[in-house]
């Protein structure tokens, strides 16, 4: 699925993106294209993670693409010395197993608990990002941030509604 033309068209109506935005769709499980995609970028925003409607038979079908894709994007951002790497993580990475209303960088969801493949994937991918950065010499690190929204929704940019929007549609129809 090539969502780039629809996304570029939508965003260009909202803000001036001419020569300022590159949208890349890459395979989370393959090395091809990551370094080229980050070349010349000041910022890399990683928004991809598998979201499935039904629990997979093997949770690694969701966990591995999330972790591996995130690390591929991060390594390419580091190699290309971007100013900042932004990971769209999830409340799932920090919010389960705590009895509180406010969360900070010390709170983590325990992926060993029975919390579902998607929730595990977000916790494990974000932890992998921070662990990778911490493993590097200070001089090789880049600025990174993870955002942890509870839900990301918006207008569909193509005929493919996407899983998040499909959940909302099903709830509105009373079929979820």
PLM feature spans:
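Residues in the short beta-alpha loop(s) of Rossmann-like NAD(P)-binding domains
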Residues: 1-4, 91
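NAD(P)H-binding glycine-rich loop region in Rossmannoid oxidoreductase-like domains
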Residues: 3-68
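Short aromatic-enriched loop/helix-cap "lid" or pocket-rim segments at secondary-structure transitions
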Residues: 8-10, 97-101, 156-161
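Short, conserved catalytic or adaptor-binding loops enriched in Gly and charged residues
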Residues: 11-18, 134-137, 170
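Conserved Rossmann-fold NAD(P)-dependent oxidoreductase catalytic core, especially the SDR/UDP-sugar
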Residues: 46, 50, 55-118
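Active-site Tyr-X1-5-Lys
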Residues: 113-144
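NAD(P)-dependent short-chain dehydrogenase/reductase
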Residues: 136-176
């Amino acid at each position: 699925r090539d969502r780039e033309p629809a996304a570029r068209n939508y965003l260009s109506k909202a803000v001036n993106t001419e020569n300022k935005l590159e949208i890349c769709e890459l395979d989370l499980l393959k090395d091809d294209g990551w370094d080229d995609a980050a070349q010349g970028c000041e910022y890399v925003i990683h928004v991809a993670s598998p979201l499935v409607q039904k629990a997979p038979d093997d949770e690694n079908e969701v966990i591995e693409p999330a972790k591996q894709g995130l690390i591929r994007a991060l390594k390419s951002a580091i190699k290309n010395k971007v100013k900042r790497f932004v990971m769209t993580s999830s409340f799932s990475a920090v919010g389960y197993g705590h009895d509180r209303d406010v969360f900070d960088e010390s709170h983590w969801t325990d992926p060993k608990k029975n919390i579902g493949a998607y929730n595990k994937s977000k916790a494990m991918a974000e932890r992998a990002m921070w662990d990778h950065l911490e493993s590097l010499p200070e001089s090789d690190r880049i600025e990174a941030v993870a955002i942890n929204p509870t839900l990301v929704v918006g207008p569909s940019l193509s005929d493919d509604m996407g899983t998040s929007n499909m959940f909302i549609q099903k709830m509105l129809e009373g079929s979820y």
